């Protein structure tokens, strides 16, 4: 399993980007979450079954939705012992 954390910057808050991300993740049967950060970025934690699944998700993120403008995606691989387990993918408020 691949566990990744993303920090997305650009025009990503107030434009439906979290909902867009949740839709993609749920369509791909991913687990994790998406949430807005106080500094204007969006944080995503996602668990993938395959590298191909991860690459597809990242490609869709880079394109964003029609209202967003993605300037940068910072990616971090999470430790195998990442403490949270998820049953689905959801938006944290």
From Swiss-Prot:
- One short Pfam name that applies is Acylphosphatase
Q: Which GO terms describe its molecular function?
A: acylphosphatase activity
Q: Which reaction does it catalyse?
A: an acyl phosphate + H2O = a carboxylate + phosphate + H(+)
Superkingdom of the source species: Bacteria
Taking every annotated instance into account, which residue ranges of this chain make up the domain Acylphosphatase-like? 3-93
Q: PROSITE patterns per the record?
A: ACYLPHOSPHATASE_1 (PS00150), ACYLPHOSPHATASE_3 (PS51160)
Q: What is its EC number?
A: 3.6.1.7
Q: Which SUPFAM superfamilies match?
A: Acylphosphatase/BLUF domain-like (SSF54975)
Listed A to Z, the keywords are: Hydrolase, Plasmid
- What is annotated as the active site? 18, 36
Q: Which InterPro entries match?
A: Acylphosphatase (IPR020456), Acylphosphatase-like_dom (IPR001792), Acylphosphatase-like_dom_sf (IPR036046), Acylphosphatase_CS (IPR017968)
What family classification does the UniProt entry report for this protein?
Answer: Belongs to the acylphosphatase family.
Q: Which PANTHER family match?
A: ACYLPHOSPHATASE
Instruction: List the protein's name.
Output: Acylphosphatase
């Amino acid at each position: 399993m691949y566990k990744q954390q993303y920090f997305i910057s650009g025009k990503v808050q107030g434009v439906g980007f979290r909902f867009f991300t949740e839709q993609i993740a749920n369509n791909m049967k991913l687990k994790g979450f998406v949430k807005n950060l106080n500094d204007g970025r969006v944080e995503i934690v996602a668990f993938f079954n395959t590298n191909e699944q991860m690459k597809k998700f990242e490609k869709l993120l880079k394109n964003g939705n029609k209202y967003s403008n993605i300037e940068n995606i910072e990616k971090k691989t999470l430790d195998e012992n990442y403490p949270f387990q998820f049953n689905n993918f959801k938006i944290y408020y």
